C-alpha cells in the first residue's frame, strides 16, 4: 500500500454515529482500530456491497487515490498491520501467550457467537427483524427477507451443532461460557493476558460485551453479563478509555 495511514471507512449494521452496533465483530474492529489510535469514519453497509457478503467491511483510501474494500474483522486487522497502519498488539507475546490469546478468541467467536446467535435469531427473531439489523428494510420486503434469513440461520445452527441442543442446554452453555470468561478477566484493572496493554483477544471480548449489553434481542445474555462484576468493570473501563464518545449501554 502506498500510505501507512490510510483514510478508513468502516461499514456497519446501523447508521447511528456515536453508538455501538449489535454486531460483536463490528465493535471488535472498532475497538481494534481505537487500540491503535487509527481514526476512521462509519457508514451503514450492505451485505451486497461487502466482498465476502458480511459485516463489517472497510474501504481503505490511499493518498494516491487508490481504494480497496475488505471484509472480515480478522482479515482487515491483518491487512492493516501488514501495511503499518496499526500496531501488532500481539508482537511481544510468547508462543504460549499467543496460543492463549487465540484460544480466547476462538471461545468467543467460534462458540459464544453461536450461543448468542441462537438467542437473538431463534428465541427473539421478531426483535432482530423489526428492531435490529433488518429494521431499515421496508415492512413487506422485510417479512420475506426475514423468513429467508431465519431459515438460513436455523440451518447453520443445526449444522454447527448449537441448534441441536434444547433451550435449557443452550442457556446452561451460555452461562458456563460467560462465567469462564469472567474468571479470565479476574479482579483489578488489567487486560485479559495481564499485560500493560490490550491484545487481539481484548478487542474480541469488548466486541462481544458491548454488543451484548446494547442489543435488545439478547435479554438473557445481557442479564448474565450484568451479573458478572469483573466483566462489567472491564467493559466500563474500556468504554471510558476508548469509547467515551459513544452512548453507553443502559
Question: What are the language-model segments listed below?
Answer:
Residues 1-12, 240-250:
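Eukaryotic N-terminal targeting leaders
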Residues 2-143:
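GST-like domain detector, emphasizing the conserved glutathione-binding G-site
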Residues 28-35, 79, 173-184, 237:
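Amphipathic alpha-helical segments that form well-ordered structural scaffolds
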Residues 36, 187-188, 241:
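Structured helix-beta-strand junction loops
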Residues 114-230:
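GST-like fold's C-terminal all-alpha helical module
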Residues 230-237:
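Intrinsically disordered, low-complexity polar regions and short flexible loop motifs
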Amino acid at each position: 500500500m502506498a500510505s501507512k495511514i490510510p483514510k478508513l471507512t468502516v461499514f456497519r449494521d446501523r447508521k447511528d454515529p456515536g453508538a455501538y452496533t449489535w454486531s460483536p465483530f463490528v465493535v471488535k474492529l472498532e475497538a481494534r482500530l481505537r487500540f491503535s489510535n487509527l481514526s476512521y469514519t462509519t457508514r451503514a453497509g450492505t451485505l451486497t456491497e461487502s466482498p465476502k457478503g458480511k459485516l463489517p467491511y472497510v474501504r481503505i483510501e490511499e493518498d494516491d487515490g487508490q481504494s480497496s474494500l475488505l471484509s472480515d474483522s480478522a482479515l482487515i486487522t491483518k491487512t492493516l498491520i501488514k501495511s503499518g497502519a496499526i500496531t501488532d498488539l500481539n508482537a511481544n507475546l510468547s508462543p504460549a501467550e499467543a496460543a492463549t490469546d487465540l484460544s480466547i478468541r476462538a471461545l468467543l467467536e467460534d462458540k459464544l457467537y453461536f450461543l448468542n446467535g441462537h438467542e437473538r435469531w431463534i428465541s427473539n427473531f421478531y426483535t432482530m427483524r423489526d428492531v435490529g439489523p433488518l429494521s431499515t428494510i421496508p415492512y413487506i420486503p422485510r417479512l420475506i427477507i426475514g423468513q429467508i434469513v431465519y431459515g438460513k440461520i436455523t440451518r447453520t445452527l443445526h449444522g454447527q451443532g448449537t441448534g441441536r441442543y434444547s433451550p435449557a442446554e443452550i442457556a446452561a452453555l451460555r452461562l458456563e461460557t460467560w462465567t469462564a470468561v469472567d474468571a479470565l478477566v479476574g479482579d483489578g484493572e488489567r487486560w485479559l493476558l495481564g499485560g500493560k496493554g490490550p491484545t487481539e483477544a481484548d478487542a474480541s471480548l469488548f466486541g462481544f460485551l458491548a454488543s451484548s449489553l446494547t442489543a435488545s434481542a439478547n435479554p438473557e445474555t445481557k442479564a448474565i453479563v450484568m451479573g458478572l462484576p469483573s466483566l462489567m468493570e472491564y467493559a466500563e473501563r474500556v468504554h471510558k478509555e476508548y469509547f467515551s464518545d459513544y452512548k453507553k449501554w443502559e
